[in-house]
């Protein structure tokens, strides 16, 4: 995987942060961030997507694993944005763990 391939995560996170700071009516991200259940709605989605990813792995369905992992990563990015944690914060923690 190249840095350019990973840049899509930064791009998606930037869009999520923009939606957080500049809400757009009808935006799915805004509907999660502004849901009446608050962070619990986002966590429900993270849990749902985690379960779907696990089932895809169990079924050894490569296409479904990729699809569900993408959904999971997206909802994890929304969760991070909601809790004011950046991808840089995560990258720094990962760097600490690689040695």
From Swiss-Prot:
<dbReference type="InterPro" id="IPR008179">
    <property type="entry name" value="HisE"/>
</dbReference>
<dbReference type="GO" id="GO:0004636">
    <property type="term" value="F:phosphoribosyl-ATP diphosphatase activity"/>
</dbReference>
<keyword id="KW-0378">Hydrolase</keyword>
<dbReference type="GO" id="GO:0005737">
    <property type="term" value="C:cytoplasm"/>
</dbReference>
<keyword id="KW-0963">Cytoplasm</keyword>
<comment type="similarity">
    <text>Belongs to the PRA-PH family.</text>
</comment>
<comment type="pathway">
    <text>Amino-acid biosynthesis; L-histidine biosynthesis; L-histidine from 5-phospho-alpha-D-ribose 1-diphosphate: step 2/9.</text>
</comment>
<keyword id="KW-0547">Nucleotide-binding</keyword>
<keyword id="KW-0368">Histidine biosynthesis</keyword>
<dbReference type="InterPro" id="IPR021130">
    <property type="entry name" value="PRib-ATP_PPHydrolase-like"/>
</dbReference>
<dbReference type="Pfam" id="PF01503">
    <property type="entry name" value="PRA-PH"/>
</dbReference>
<keyword id="KW-0067">ATP-binding</keyword>
<dbReference type="GO" id="GO:0005524">
    <property type="term" value="F:ATP binding"/>
</dbReference>
<keyword id="KW-0028">Amino-acid biosynthesis</keyword>
<dbReference type="GO" id="GO:0000105">
    <property type="term" value="P:L-histidine biosynthetic process"/>
</dbReference>
<protein>
    <recommendedName>
        <fullName>Phosphoribosyl-ATP pyrophosphatase</fullName>
        <ecNumber>3.6.1.31</ecNumber>
    </recommendedName>
</protein>
